[in-house]
Structures are given as C-alpha cells and as structure tokens.
Regions:
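Active-site C-terminal subdomain of aminotransferase-like
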Residues: 257-362, 366-369
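N-terminal entrance/gating region of PLP-dependent enzymes' catalytic architecture
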Residues: 19-102, 108
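Flexible, glycine-rich loop/tail regions that form catalytic "lids" or insertion modules at the edges
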Residues: 26-27, 43, 64-65, 344, ...
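PLP-dependent enzyme catalytic core of the Aspartate aminotransferase-like
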Residues: 3, 105, 361, 403-436
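Compact, charge-rich alpha-helical regulatory domains located at protein termini
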Residues: 1-24
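Conserved PLP-enzyme active-site core in the AAT-like
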Residues: 95, 125-295, 363, 367, ...
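Short loop-beta-helix segment that forms the pyridoxal 5′-phosphate
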Residues: 54, 88-92, 109-128
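Gly-rich Lys/Arg/Thr-decorated short loops/hinges at beta-loop-alpha junctions or inter-strand turns
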Residues: 78-90, 108-113, 139-141, 165-171, ...
Length: 436
C-alpha cells in the first residue's frame, strides 16, 4: 500500500503533524474481533444506557415521547426511501418528490400558511433560518425580538446564526412571572421602526399557550414580521393555526410525528410562510407539474434560490433535508387523519390536566396561571434533589428550569403524553414526595 501511494514509511503520512501532538507511548489496542465478538461488545456497551422503557418519563422540553405506529416504521424502512442519498437533483424519483410534496401540503394545513419547504434539520435551525428569511424580506431593519419563553437551545442556535451579522441586534422580551406568557407591555416598548421580527413559542418553553394573535398585532403595527415557533407539533392538531392568527412565518420541530426520542435526534424542522415570500424561503421546494403527455408529476421548483445553483447568493446553506424524517411525519399524519390528530392532541391535554390535578392534591402547586397544552411548570423545593430521588424510584420527573431561568428557582417542567397513564401520576407524586 505504501508503495502504491508513493511513501516509504507509515510515519510519512503524519509528517505534517507537530511532534508535540503525536502520541509517543504505545497505543494499547485490543486484538481484532470477529463479527460475533463485535456484536457482543457493542451490545454490552449499549446495555449501559437507560432507555425510555426503563422509566416512567415526564421529560419534555422540546422533544416528546409519542407512540409511533408500526406502519410508520415499516414505510420508512423500505429500500426505496431508506438511503443516504439526498434527493435534491432533478432526477430524484417521483415517489420521493411526491412524498415531499405531500409533506409540504400537510405542513401548510397544520400551520394555516400557503407554502412550506421540504424540511429543515430541526426546529432550532428552522427558527434561525426564519429570522434570516425575515432579514431578506426587510433588509433595512435590524432588531430581532425573541421572547424569553422560547426554548433556550432555540435561542442559542439563533444567536449562533446571527453572530457574524453586525447589523442585527438581538433583544429578549421578558415574560410575565404570573402567567408564564410573553410580557406584551414590554414587547410594545420594543416595537419601534427598526423591529425586524418577533420570535414566539406556540406553545412556549413552559407549555403555556401564548396569546399569539395579540403578539402578531403588536408586531404588525410596527411593520415587522411575526415568527411562530412550535416545538411540540402535536399542539397544531388542536390549536388555532399560526397563519390564521396572522403569523407571517411558522416553524417548528416535527419529531412528535412518528419519530422516537433517540439521544435528542434526529429531528425534523419545518417552515411555512405566505406565498408572497416564497422566493425568500430556505431549503428545497417541490412543486406539482405535468409532463409533455399531460401526466401529473413532481419536480424541484424555484431552485435558483438554493446553494447547489447559486452558492454565494443562495437563501440558505441547508445542504440536505431530512427526507426520511419527513416521510415518517407524512406517513404518521396520513394514518392519523385530521380527526385522529385532533383527538390525540385533546387526549394529551386531558392527561396533562389530570397529572396536574394529582400533583395539586399532594400540595404541589402550578407555577403559572395561563392555559397550557401537554406540559406545565410546578414549584417544588430543590428540584435537583427531587428529580434525583425520583429517578432512583424509576421516574423521570421532569426538567429543572433554574439553570436556564434563574428567576424560576424551584420550577419543574412536567410533560405528559399518551405514553403516560393515570397510574403513572400516582408514581410521580410518590416519587416527588419521597415515598414508594
């Protein structure tokens, strides 16, 4: 091999690496393994992890454990779809492009907007791309107002995307400590003629259903763009669509639609907007057309916006879309149907309120008064210690908020989905009270 590549010694391959960075001691590598030994080793390593089935889980905060129908897994495992190849070229199969078109259609129906793209990396990147899209629409404005009730990792991603843009000022809008919703009076004070956009969770990071319609009104009076962000996509099966409330761009995380919680990913970002702004959208768009024989077909459209056509002037540098995840969401939504999705969303709401009632019966009080979807905040003494004690009893009690929200010391975010049962609420109460 060395002779073939034209070097005399193996060390020649690392000659460019400084001596101080090279390992001098012998590397203790185990002997080679056959396939069965590798499988046993990897299985043993995996067994050291704790999975969702090992606990009663009330964790949420941006990723949610919902039931994934077997049909979704079967469809996404088909060889026609399960491939590492990104379908971005003109010769992408009609099956793939039709699936993406159907996904886009479903997202527009959920968001109440006219156009959606083929998908984004995740909800956080979709939110950041929405801000950049707003900047392209209103290039002379430079203030981005983000509600503090937006998920902290979404805020961090937006900051990263904007860090090199010196003409953009990112400001945080405080929240009402009584309701857990965005402080509208504070937003009014920020709504000047430099306001580019507002970014609001719907529901927000506390599970609270924000008064999105009123936020949109304040935003539009300033001539700015309203961006709605939904991390728990199931909520869109029950809540009034962001577009119907006047939002200009709606983004979110579609993981709840047929994807498991697996080390926090993969996710499925979605973005939808009004048709008048379609040329400023990031990512890929699939459109419906007809071939020379009049047969219906699907193709990538408005491709000149994209980086594989015009790299320097592209609307985004999204180098791939999450087509397989989009397929899972499409299959899931098709299986559920409009009525099924609404019933499941309502079931989540009912379970969450039952869980809160059980906690209130044990003297644990809700932190906020505003309506919520399927997660809520309660106040407990020493959430860190309480969560650790609950975990020892096989219960993942929720997410402590103080690390990201110091003013919510004692706040615990509890998430409830159809994977929880009412018997679990008793275990949660006992675990937090140190019983059982």
């Amino acid at each position: 091999m060395l002779e073939t590549i034209g070097v005399a010694h193996l060390e020649d391959l690392v000659a460019h690496v400084p001596e101080k960075l090279r390992a001098t001691a012998a590397i203790n590598l185990a002997s080679s393994m056959d396939e069965a030994e590798v499988a046993a080793e990897v299985t043993a390593l995996a067994a050291r992890n704790s999975g969702a089935l090992d606990f009663v889980s009330f964790l949420g905060g941006g990723y949610y454990r919902h039931y994934v129908p077997a049909a979704v897994r079967a469809i996404t495992a088909r060889a026609e779809f399960a491939t590492s190849y990104t379908p971005y070229q003109a010769e992408a199969s009609q099956g793939t492009t039709q699936m993406i078109f159907e996904f886009q259609t479903l997202i527009t129906q959920l968001t109440g907007l006219e156009v959606a793209n083929a998908s984004m990396y995740d909800g956080a990147s979709a939110a950041a791309e929405a801000v950049l899209m707003a900047r392209r629409i209103l290039p002379k404005r430079g203030v981005v107002a983000i509600s503090r009730t937006l998920w902290p990792d979404y805020c961090a991603t937006i900051r990263t995307y904007l860090s090199a843009l010196t003409d953009i000022d990112l400001v945080e809008v405080p929240f009402d400590l009584a309701t857990g919703a965005t402080d509208l009076a504070a937003l009014e004070r920020l709504a000047g003629d430099r306001l580019l956009c507002t970014v609001t969770g719907y529901p927000n990071a506390f599970g609270v259903i924000e008064p999105l319609g009123r936020i949109v009104e304040v935003t539009h009076r300033a001539g700015a763009i309203s961006i709605s962000v939904t991390a728990e996509a199931l909520a869109l099966g029950l809540l009034k669509p962001p577009g119907a409330l006047g939002a200009d761009i709606a983004v979110g995380e579609g993981q709840s639609f047929g994807m498991a919680v697996e080390f926090g990913g993969p996710g499925l970002g979605f973005i939808a907007a009004r048709a008048q702004n379609v040329r400023q959208m990031p990512g890929r768009l699939v459109g419906q057309t007809h071939d020379p024989d009049g047969r219906r077909g699907f193709c990538l459209t408005l491709a000149a916006r994209e980086q594989h056509i015009r790299r320097e002037r592209a609307t985004s540098n999204i180098c791939t879309n999450h087509s397989l995840c989009a397929l899972a969401a499409t299959a899931y939504l098709a299986l559920m149907g409009r009525r099924g999705l609404r019933e499941l969303a309502a079931h989540n709401v009912a379970l969450a309120h039952d869980a809160l009632a059980a906690l209130e019966g044990a003297g644990i009080r809700p932190r906020f008064s505003a309506p919520f979807f399927n997660e809520f905040v309660v106040s407990i003494d020493n959430p860190g210690a309480s969560r650790a004690a609950a975990e020892r009893r096989g219960v993942l009690a929720g997410l402590a908020l103080a690390p990201d929200y110091p003013e919510l010391r004692g706040g615990l975010l509890v998430s409830v989905t159809e994977m929880n049962h009412r018997i679990h609420f008793t275990r949660l109460v006992e675990a937090l009270r140190g019983q059982g």
